[in-house]
Amino acid sequence: MEEGSSSPVSPVDSLGTSEEELERQPKRFGRKRRYSKKSSEDGSPTPGKRGKKGSPSAQSFEELQSQRILANVRERQRTQSLNEAFAALRKIIPTLPSDKLSKIQTLKLAARYIDFLYQVLQSDEMDNKMTSCSYVAHERLSYAFSVWRMEGAWSMSASH
């Protein structure tokens, strides 16, 4: 327990910190993470370093702008990848024609569909002929899942 309080992250022991210092620490650590390249050049984020950020040179402004552009590109790619994954998931899950599923609804329905398929595999209700034709098997499962949903085994809430 003593070793955790004297970690390298907080150089001052918890006994020697005032409330004011504790309030400043999260802000300082937040800035250090945000400007990790800048603060790691000289080893520590100092108040003098903040003064230089107030009047950035043309090079640092361009550098920050290019970093922001790259971050935006990465975020767009991540969002596009996520949307493509949800589109693929929506194609797999049997839905009703009236369904306009949000992402959370899609995930919840997918989880319920997996549970439904597991129950189907565990039961002897389906005969072995279904495995001979995957298209027919998929259509039967889709129909059975739709009936299962309509019977109220799983109701979709509009608030989710």
UniProtKB/Swiss-Prot annotation:
SMART domains: HLH (SM00353). One of its GO terms (cellular component) is nucleus. Residues 27-37 have a biased composition (Basic residues). It is found in: Nucleus; Cytoplasm. PROSITE patterns: BHLH (PS50888). GO terms for molecular function: chromatin binding; DNA-binding transcription factor activity; DNA-binding transcription factor activity, RNA polymerase II-specific; protein dimerization activity; protein domain specific binding; RNA polymerase II transcription regulatory region sequence-specific DNA binding. Residues 66-117 form the bHLH domain. Residues 1-63 are annotated as: Disordered. Its main location: nucleus. InterPro entries: bHLH_dom, E-box_TF_Regulators, HLH_DNA-bd_sf, Twist2_bHLH. SUPFAM superfamilies: HLH, helix-loop-helix DNA-binding domain. Keywords: Cytoplasm, Developmental protein, Differentiation, DNA-binding, Nucleus, Repressor, Transcription, Transcription regulation. GO terms for biological process: cell population proliferation; cornea development in camera-type eye; developmental process; embryonic cranial skeleton morphogenesis; face morphogenesis; keratinocyte proliferation; myeloid cell differentiation; negative regulation of apoptotic process. Efficient DNA binding requires dimerization with another bHLH protein. Forms a heterodimer with TCF3/E12. Also interacts with MEF2C. Binds to the E-box consensus sequence 5'-CANNTG-3' as a heterodimer and inhibits transcriptional activation by MYOD1, MYOG, MEF2A and MEF2C. Also represses expression of pro-inflammatory cytokines such as TNFA and IL1B. Involved in postnatal glycogen storage and energy metabolism. Inhibits the premature or ectopic differentiation of preosteoblast cells during osteogenesis, possibly by changing the internal signal transduction response of osteoblasts to external growth factors. This is Twist-related protein 2. The gene is Twist2.
